[in-house]
Curated annotation (Swiss-Prot):
Coiled coil location: none
Gene Ontology terms for molecular function: GTP binding; guanyl nucleotide binding; microtubule nucleator activity
Protein name: Tubulin gamma-1 chain
Subcellular localization(s) per the UniProt record: Cytoplasm, Cytoskeleton, Microtubule organizing center, Centrosome; Cytoplasm, Cytoskeleton, Microtubule organizing center; Cytoplasm, Perinuclear region
Primary localization class, coarse: cytoplasm
Family: Belongs to the tubulin family.
Species this protein is from: Drosophila melanogaster (Fruit fly)
PANTHER family the UniProt entry points to: TUBULIN (PTHR11588)
Gene: gammaTub23C
Length: 475
């Protein structure tokens, strides 16, 4: 039974990473840029229907909705060789085309005004699915459209489709660069509230860490947006391989995420990927014969902080720990090696886990696309729920407090209806994020379950019966 997923791309960043994601999916499924199945793509063991549907003339169309308040990025996509891939009825550009001016309040207000037109598209796409499982939302938390309009759409999706999963790929700003968006701390705080309350699962894409990895691991001096987005598309595509190349476990979104999220609030996920190679490495063959990849080698490297795509900062008190881990392993893998590797990791205590739950390391073995050549025998993606992610939220709180204390740049927000009478929404958002930090800090302690129950955040009330049976490694 298909479990279709609709992808929503919002704003400049969301549409850019979404575009790279669809390019990669087309490559992996043997679909041409115009949506036609290539002659060589006769494997037949993949499930294209999760992310694509077939038009009357049999060409494949992404289950994607492209939304923006200014035209530049979407015009670039629709002017590319992939222009015939998308359903033009699923592309929405605001008629005035002025954008949100990097202002969350403007993006949110415009989302509210345009909701009828936008949800006509989303509802039509949902109605065209046989068994819709949920939505994937791609956006940035720091700008105007992806953060503001994205927040509005997230809230409405949760209201309109309460039984469907909402997973986001959320890009966090680069902390090593001075932002030209002066209200970025406000935008981030307001978006984080919605990611906490409206999303079921948030994959954090931290630009600080992505740039560091591009420099340190891929040896790219000044990584471009395109190179970073390519890295993101790898994370997105590998995280969905078990849905597109299904086996007996982890073959739907709830089965993938349920073991990672023990309580509703703790749903922010980190990623790691290894081995990493850049296009230049492949072309110059710099990495030939450097390493023989094995399951243990890959799983061990995934636990190294330098491979994590979130910059959490030093853990001076050494109290942060893993809540759960899912490793998606691709390549030539003997299942017995997986069990041996898991045992080795446990015996050597390579990872520190929560004191109130089991050592939860899940492993999903996934086939790779037969149409894309890999340079490695084995590769792996880690999706991890780790308490140190709260340092990212603490950083956002500190930046917000500095700006809010001075009362800086608030006039831009007061112009919009949501802030016309007062600034309560900002303060409530701060409180939500502060509670989130406390929740993750509490998760490092043995008494976490009592803390969580007091707050009314018991174990996840799943949106699917499937999740109750997902408890062991898919190997």
């Amino acid at each position: 039974m298909p479990s279709e997923i609709i992808t929503l791309q919002l704003g400049q960043c969301g549409n850019q990473i979404g575009f790279e994601f669809w390019k990669r999916l087309c490559l992996e499924h043997g679909i041409s840029p115009s949506g036609v199945l290539e002659d060589f793509a006769n494997d037949g063991l993949d499930r294209k229907d999760v992310f694509f549907y077939q038009a009357d003339d049999d060409h494949y169309i992404p289950r994607a909705v492209l939304l923006d308040l200014e035209p530049r990025v979407i015009n670039t996509i629709m002017g590319s060789v992939y222009s015939k891939l998308y359903n033009p009825e699923n592309v929405y550009l605001s008629k005035h085309g002025g954008g949100a001016g990097n202002n969350w309040a403007s993006g949110y207000s415009q989302g509210e005004k345009l909701q009828e037109e936008v949800f006509d598209i989303i509802d039509r796409e949902a109605d065209g699915s046989d068994s819709l499982e949920g939505f994937i939302l791609c956006h940035s938390i720091a700008g105007g459209t992806g953060s503001g309009m994205g927040s509005f759409i997230m809230e409405r999706l949760a209201d309109r489709y309460p039984k469907k999963l909402i997973q986001t790929f959320s890009v966090f700003p680069n902390q090593d660069e001075i932002s030209d968006v002066v209200v970025q701390p406000y935008n981030s705080m307001l978006t984080l509230k919605r990611l906490t309350t409206a999303a079921d699962s948030v994959v954090v894409l931290d630009n600080t860490a992505l740039n560091r990895i591009a420099c340190d691991r891929l040896h790219i001096q000044n990584p471009s947006f395109s190179q970073i987005n390519n890295l993101v598309s790898t994370i997105m595509s590998v995280s969905t391989t078990t849905l597109r190349y299904p086996s007996y476990m982890n073959n739907n979104l709830i089965g993938l995420t349920a073991p990672l999220i023990p309580t509703p609030q703790l749903h922010f996920l980190m990623t790691g990927y290894t081995p990493l190679t850049s296009d230049s490495d492949i072309h110059t063959q710099q990495l030939v014969n450097v390493r023989k990849t094995t399951v243990l080698d890959v799983m061990r490297r995934l636990l190294q902080p330098k491979n994590m795509m979130v910059s959490t900062g030093p853990d001076k008190s050494n109290h942060h720990c893993y809540i759960s881990i899912l490793n998606i392993i691709q390549g030539e893998v003997d299942p017995t090696q997986v069990h041996k590797s898991l045992q080795r990791i446990r015996d050597r205590k390579m990872a520190q886990f929560i004191p109130w739950g089991p050592t939860s390391i899940q492993v999903a073995l996934s086939r790779s696309s037969p149409y894309v050549q890999s340079n490695h025998r084995v590769s792996g993606l880690m999706l991890a729920n780790h308490t140190s992610i709260c340092s990212l939220f603490e950083r956002a709180l500190n930046q917000y407090d500095k700006l809010r204390k001075r009362g800086a740049f608030l006039d831009q927000f007061r112009r919009e209806d949501i802030f016309k009478d007062d600034l309560n929404e900002l303060d409530e958002s701060r409180e939500t994020v502060d509670c989130l930090v406390q929740e993750y800090e509490a998760a490092t302690r043995e008494d976490y379950m009592q803390f969580s129950v007091k707050r009314g955040n018991g174990p996840v009330d799943s949106k699917s019966e499937d999740s109750r049976s997902v408890t062991s490694a898919g190997s």
